[in-house]
Amino acid sequence: MRANSCIIAAFCAIILMAAACSAAAEKAAQDDPLLFKQDAWPLLQVHCVRCHGAKKQKMGVDFSTMTGLLSILGHRDVWRRAREALESGDMPPDPEETSFTDADRKRLMDWVRDRVETIDRRSPIYLDPGPPVLRQLTRVEYNNTIVDLLRLDRFDAASAGGIVDPSNFVSEHFANLAAAQSLDQTLVEKYLAAGDAALDVLFNRNAKARSALLSAHPDNQTSPHDAARVVLTRFLRRAHRQQVDGDELDELLGIFDDATRAGDGFEPAIRKAMRPVLVSAAFLYRIEEDRPDAGSDAYKVNDDELAVRLSYFLWSSMPDDELFALADAGRLSQPDVLDAQIKRILADPRARALTDNFAASWLRLAMMNRALPSQDVFPALTRSLKDAMRQEPALFFDNLRAEDRSILDLLDADYTFANEELARFYGIPGVSGPKMQKVALSPQFHRGGLLGMGCILAMTSHTDRTKPTARGKWILDVLLGTPPPPPPANAGNFAAPNNHAAPPKNFREKLALHASDASCAACHKRIDPLGFALENYDGAGAWRDSDAGKPVDNVGRLPRGKEFQGVEGLKQVLHERQEQFIRNVVTQMMTYALGRQLQYTDDLAVADIVDALKRDDYRFSTLIRGVVMSRPFLYRRNG
């Protein structure tokens, strides 16, 4: 009966939501300042429908079905992608062929921006904080939580129980996304082994941690049962990260009492009571309870849930005592208190987790572990140099947090981090010792920002040469958030056509020949120019002015015909697409914080954070505060 009621309630909620959206769209249609049929549809018919219409739907887009505001409302994600393609010049792919002028581009972009913003702010659907997700602790979060819960110095679930993350950091997903996670019987057994190992360290090898955790002991005034109640109440509060359930506490006390009746002492009995907690759903998952009285309406998460969201976002671990105390007092959600906690948590060394878990995944830094360049071809690329290269982007990103710098430093900066070996590889004098340190840069070194870092350049190279396509794709994927579609099945085939008069003279000509294939041309026009701009860096990331005795060809040409040269020209191109980069950083950070892919209902939150960054010099703390203060972070709805 309850299941049927839930289905009926959900169906009614969908109908009500659709009706509300319909009404909003109809109202928007009445006072639409840029009429769709006059300003947008004629341009789409002439320049877009040929590839994105009823007969052909490239990228799965069919504009022929979107002939009014109601249909537009249901395809907001498509319009967002269209706006980005127009802004970047990626679409139309051949503007000259279709007579698509700059005025046409501006008119269509103006219409898309106005419609997206107008519809977004009027539609009640944008009050939706997004679907609730059930998030399992990642291996890193599990390790950190065990350490903080049991007051240990360190713990490694991989060695203790064989636990690894359910998703791969090298993939396009963060390991903490709910959709990438699962829990089966084998993993439960591994968690049980890891929990036993952690309790073994606590009770047998760490007297200081044990003393802190066992806050009560039996004596003449306190019975073993009463002392256990004190210890287990606090332990359960911190382990489950929510208010203590009396029935669960009684179950643990029952385990304790059974153990003492069987002859166990106080500490062995406490250990037996703690054991099931470490494999409980409330420990392994971040559980947020639905509120039946809320119906389909969004509601603020409670202070316990907010503390958990905040600490796992910024520390990849459980709340500390201060967060628990504020949550218990019902004060954490007060704006001034929450703002102060954001500053405190960001300043804590544990916030390095943002670098280790967010930045490492977003930037695909794990690719460096299997970077292809060979030391036989590039003798300077020693193991120690590779290690320094790995550290550079991580230290750089963490410095943005520690010094609250502009996130635009990721595109270009007058400093980096290097030790003596890496500085020598870069041609930077005056750096000594094996320790990584902050180093000032000048233009003559051709570094600054992510694009000048050896790690990024080496991990996007072949064994014996550069790989412009991989470098260009990394820029589109990671920096701009506009990944090209997967290549066709024969994309790796570089064989020249039979009618080609002469073989290509160099790799650039070979790639150009390959890109001339109709199935490859559109993507390579976007990808290759960006990669060729980095040709002054060899396969290992060292600067060079010539290749095989000839000057390096580092000229790129964008789809709209604009030429640029070298890494400095590329940085200028990225500067012109700065808002797209900022929006992508915000999108990536929100995805990581929420544990789910964003949807079009999150667009307003993203736009508000982008606007806040513009007003505050793009400071790192403004990005984090914007995410935490956003509606999707502070609110939830029933599943």
Predicted stretch roles:
Residues 21-214, 237-238, 242-245, 249-254, ...:
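Aromatic- and Gly/Pro-enriched helix-to-coil junctions and flexible linker segments
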